[in-house]
Amino acid sequence: MTIKPLIILPDPVLRQQSKLIEQVDAEVLRLADDMLETMYDAPGIGLAAIQIGVPRRMLVIDVAREGEEKTPVVFINPEILKVSDDISTYEEGCLSIPDYYAEVERPASLTVQYVGRDGKQQTVEADGLLATCLQHEIDHLNGVLFIDHISRLKRDMVIKKFTKAARAKI
C-alpha cells in the first residue's frame, strides 16, 4: 500500500467526471488499498479516486469514531438510487480543500447501489454521517465539490484563497 499525494483546490482535475470501472481486478484492489492508506494518513473519513488524480468511479469511506475498530468500505461505481425528502445539515470538510469547513444541507438518508471489493453488486441504506459522506464523495466522482453547495460568495472566497496559495507555491 502506498500513500498517494492529494489533489488540492484549485487543481482542475477535481472537476473531471470519473469513468466507470469495468472490472474489479488486482489493479483496482491495489488502488482501493492505496486510497484507504491515503485517507487514514490524512486523516479523513472518505476519499474519492479523483482526489489522488485517478478519474475512476471509486471511493472509500470509514466513519468509525476515533478509538473504535476501523470499518473501511470500498464503493466501486456507486449510484444513488433514492434520497429522502428530509434534509440534514453537517459541517463538512474535504481533504482537497484543507482546513476549510462549512455547513452543507443534504438529504438525510439515501439508498446507494455499488460494487464491492468482491466484485458483487450491493446496496446500502444510509443515514446520518454515512449518508452525508456518501453524497460528498459521490459528488467528487461527478466533478462537484462541497463548496458548490454553499453560497456563491463564500465559494468564490474559498477558490480565491486556494488559487492565491497555489500561485505562491510556484
Swiss-Prot record:
Gene3D superfamilies: Peptide deformylase. Belongs to the polypeptide deformylase family. Keywords: Hydrolase, Iron, Metal-binding, Protein biosynthesis. Binds 1 Fe(2+) ion. One of its GO terms (molecular function) is metal ion binding. It catalyses: N-terminal N-formyl-L-methionyl-[peptide] + H2O = N-terminal L-methionyl-[peptide] + formate. Removes the formyl group from the N-terminal Met of newly synthesized proteins. Requires at least a dipeptide for an efficient rate of reaction. N-terminal L-methionine is a prerequisite for activity but the enzyme has broad specificity at other positions. Its EC number is 3.5.1.88. Its cofactor is Fe(2+). The active site is at residue 137. It is an enzyme of class 3 (hydrolase). Fe cation binds at residues 94, 136, 140. InterPro entries: Peptide_deformylase (IPR023635), Peptide_deformylase_sf (IPR036821). This is Peptide deformylase. One of its GO terms (biological process) is co-translational protein modification.
